[in-house]
């Protein structure tokens, strides 16, 4: 299982692995929401893109507040996608 011999080190290894899996799942979910907005923009559907953007914004902000991604990365995602949605006629 782990290379750790000390009980506390074994526990930390188990907790780290559990946290890693949870974070990976959260990161994947966030990326999916972002991709939905990009797909709507690529299709040229402004109303769908705006709805997807609102959902994506909530998720990205939540991930930033929990420390999964940096706040600036969240801001960059929101700014870039918002600009692309505004370009749609």
Swiss-Prot record:
Q: Which family does it belong to?
A: Belongs to the bacterial ribosomal protein bS20 family.
Give me any GO biological process, just one: translation
Q: Which InterPro entries match?
A: Ribosomal_bS20 (IPR002583), Ribosomal_bS20_sf (IPR036510)
Organism name = Pasteurella multocida (strain Pm70)
Provide one Gene Ontology cellular component: small ribosomal subunit
Pfam families listed in its UniProt record: Ribosomal_S20p (PF01649)
- What job does this protein perform? Binds directly to 16S ribosomal RNA.
Extract the HAMAP family matched here: Ribosomal_bS20
Q: Where is this region: Disordered?
A: 1-28
Which Gene Ontology molecular-function terms are recorded? Answer: small ribosomal subunit rRNA binding; structural constituent of ribosome
Keyword entries, A-Z: Ribonucleoprotein, Ribosomal protein, RNA-binding, rRNA-binding
Q: What is this protein called?
A: Small ribosomal subunit protein bS20
In terms of domain of life, where is this protein from? Bacteria
């Amino acid at each position: 299982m782990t290379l750790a011999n000390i009980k506390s080190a074994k526990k930390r290894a188990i907790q780290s692995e559990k946290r890693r899996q949870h974070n990976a799942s959260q990161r994947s979910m966030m990326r999916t929401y972002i991709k939905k907005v990009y797909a709507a923009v690529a299709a040229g559907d402004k109303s769908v893109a705006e709805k997807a953007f609102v959902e994506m914004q909530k998720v990205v902000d939540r991930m930033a507040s929990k420390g999964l991604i940096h706040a600036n990365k969240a801001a960059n995602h929101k700014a870039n996608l918002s600009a692309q949605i505004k370009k749609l006629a």
